[in-house]
């Protein structure tokens, strides 16, 4: 017979283990892909598989015109850029966009009922170009739809990120002025040590490289910069593209998400539901004390390359063709880019943070990052095994 004290002790231990398992489960509620994905050179030229990057969404208007990409933070919240959705009322979130062919996959849409533009967003300088969108109903998560992790608070020692990517749709012309919403593609990015662009505060920059322009020039407004957390294989949101990336070679800027972590969490908490419940993964991670995210690489740019950026900032017209949901017919839809005027902000606002370059190949190239299902992690196997042994021994 087991004593009451023994039962009490076993009950407490079982409770502690259940709490640990609860934290473990909640920590996998973001940044997890449901299948192992091969990263590196492959014959498919960077095609995104159906279960890869399930947090990337398309923001569209009531006529199903693509406005910008976005990134899922939770069942209700999507992060994107302010410049593409300002002064708009009717926006829908299209999920599972790895393949936009309606004959192959049905796409679910979620109407947006709340749009939060950063209060200090400047349409001239494009500073604070970030926005939150809340869906009317909770997005249903599955193999094709998941949330990505992001830092909900600033850390003294930043996490070590690796294997960074951006994604987008292929341009259908050599100039990149036209784009067909079809199969999503991806491009690897890496750090640079210098950038010729004028950068506002809380932005970073990167570029395409000449050698790989035969594939595609990706990176449209709102497209997330996605990186893996070293040793954990969790995907973390690094930034959202601001503008650029349409010409090859060419430069692009993106908004650094971690600098807006307080703004994101506070706005979501005020409007509800909050995002704090999704950040247990931060507590379980022992961050590395090594330097920046990745190896720094020098790169210089010619006047002709910088000219591509200038032409972009003067404004472009882009025609987007895609399949309307539930309809096999294709509509040709125009999206006119807004002209970017001269900045009214003081030059003192600029800083020199890190930057990224498309098509790098040092980290993650030619490797298989197994364990997108985090139950393959050694510490989790030990924990689960311990729980099973404990329960079996108490039967």
Swiss-Prot record:
Classification via SMART domains: Tryp_SPc (SM00020)
Q: Which positions form S-S bridges?
A: 164-227, 195-205, 217-248
What is the protein named? Inactive serine protease 54
Alphabetical list of Pfam families matching this protein: Trypsin
Q: Which residues form the Peptidase S1 domain?
A: 37-269
Q: Where in the cell is it found?
A: Secreted
- Supply one GO CC term from the record: extracellular space
User: Upper taxonomic classification of the species?
Assistant: Eukaryota, Metazoa, Chordata, Craniata, Vertebrata
The GO terms describing molecular function are:
serine-type endopeptidase activity
The reply on keyword Signal is yes
Signal sequence extent: 1-30
Please give the CDD domains that the UniProt record associates with this protein: Tryp_SPc
Instruction: Please state which protein family the record places this protein in.
Output: Belongs to the peptidase S1 family. Plasma kallikrein subfamily.
Q: Write the record's keywords in alphabetical order, separated by commas.
A: Disulfide bond, Glycoprotein, Secreted, Serine protease homolog, Signal
